[in-house]
Amino acid sequence: MERITVTLGERSYPITIAAGLFNEPASFLPLKSGDQVMLVTNETLAPLYLDKVRGVLERAGVNVDSVILPDGEQYKSLTVLDTVFTALLKKPHGRDTTLVALGGGVIGDLTGFAAASYQRGVRFIQVPTTLLSQVDSSVGGKTAVNHPLGKNMIGAFYQPASVVVDLDCLKTLPARELTSGLAEVIKYGIILDADFFTWLEGNLDALLRLDGPAMAYCIRRCCELKAEVVAADEREAGLRALLNLGHTFGHAIEAEMGYGNWLHGEAVAAGIVMAARASERLGQFSSADTQRIIALLERAGLPVNGPCEMSAQDYLPHMLRDKKVLAGELRLVLPLAIGKSEVRGGVSHEVVLSAIADCQQA
């Protein structure tokens, strides 16, 4: 069992990583006998894990209610969020309740925002079931729902009480979802850790076949990097923005194409290449490193071009609504070398459009 701490003073919390955690009541810290829980999951995961998690919590004396939501990015909305509030109020659940998010990034983000909002804030626990959520979205306290005009535009910074990563969940993960998660894994190597990027080049095949030791190391390293960044810059005033490499372009793809048609990791992968191309055009990133990135993404089965249905101009309205925009000016996360990156303002629309055009599908 691996345990990493996200250090935030009184709001510090553990990330527990191991196989078989759903069999151990102690995994679900800080829950204890007599606590009340609302378990939030989706219709795909409920048949796989709901009874198992409910059972282990009830054996520990926890009182468990549940709400099952539809599955998909398109349901990360205010309308579906209201379903959670209604379930909480009908029981009713008070301020001493704990929400447990059993699912991927959609469930985690939506449940976290529900916890931040319900009765002005209740405790919640992240139980991520996808690779993407295990390495990224469950850690750090970003919670949100989407708006038709932009992804994650309505939300709050609100930290979980703990994160429970059961590696066994990856055994039921569809191949496309596994691949999507690898985009966020590769991102960490590009922005923060050249040695990890090199390790990924040598161990990608092991990750694709769900090799246990390789996957455990991969998730642990990503969580270590994320925990360090969040501890240093919880509210994304500087360093944490680096974690958004590829996301300004990627969120534009998700919004323009319709949430769920491109998975988040797929859109981010294409966005990473666009960011690399933009950095190349500014003379601060080598074409050789861009090719290393493209080669690794392609080996993972990820797209390295944007959707053919989108023109370069289609990206700009979405990108100008990005949360990093200041005074109407685009700010992009750009790689400087493998393992090193920066947030740069003042990137011209000409450079951005040219970088997108470099990555358009024929």
From Swiss-Prot:
Single GO MF descriptor: 3-dehydroquinate synthase activity
Cofactor binding remark: Binds 1 divalent metal cation per subunit. Can use either Co(2+) or Zn(2+).
Cellular component terms per the entry's GO annotation: cytoplasm
Residues reported in the UniProt entry to bind NAD(+): 71-76, 105-109, 129-130, 142, 151, 169-172
Localization annotation: Cytoplasm
Binding site for Zn(2+): 184, 247, 264
Main EC class the enzyme belongs to: lyase
Keyword set, alphabetical order: Amino-acid biosynthesis, Aromatic amino acid biosynthesis, Cobalt, Cytoplasm, Lyase, Metal-binding, NAD, Nucleotide-binding, Zinc
Cofactor(s) the record lists: NAD(+); Co(2+); Zn(2+)
InterPro entries: Dehydroquinate_synthase (IPR050071), DHQ_synth_AroB (IPR016037), DHQ_synth_fam (IPR030963), DHQS/DOIS_N (IPR030960), DHQS_C (IPR056179)
Gene3D superfamilies according to UniProt: 3.40.50.1970, Dehydroquinate synthase-like - alpha domain
Keyword ATP-binding tagged: no
One Pfam short name: DHQS_C
Record pathway: Metabolic intermediate biosynthesis; chorismate biosynthesis; chorismate from D-erythrose 4-phosphate and phosphoenolpyruvate: step 2/7
EC number annotated for this UniProt entry: 4.2.3.4
Catalyzed reactions: 7-phospho-2-dehydro-3-deoxy-D-arabino-heptonate = 3-dehydroquinate + phosphate
Similarity section: Belongs to the sugar phosphate cyclases superfamily. Dehydroquinate synthase family.
Function field: Catalyzes the conversion of 3-deoxy-D-arabino-heptulosonate 7-phosphate (DAHP) to dehydroquinate (DHQ).
Stated name of the protein: 3-dehydroquinate synthase
Natural source organism: Salmonella typhimurium (strain LT2 / SGSC1412 / ATCC 700720)
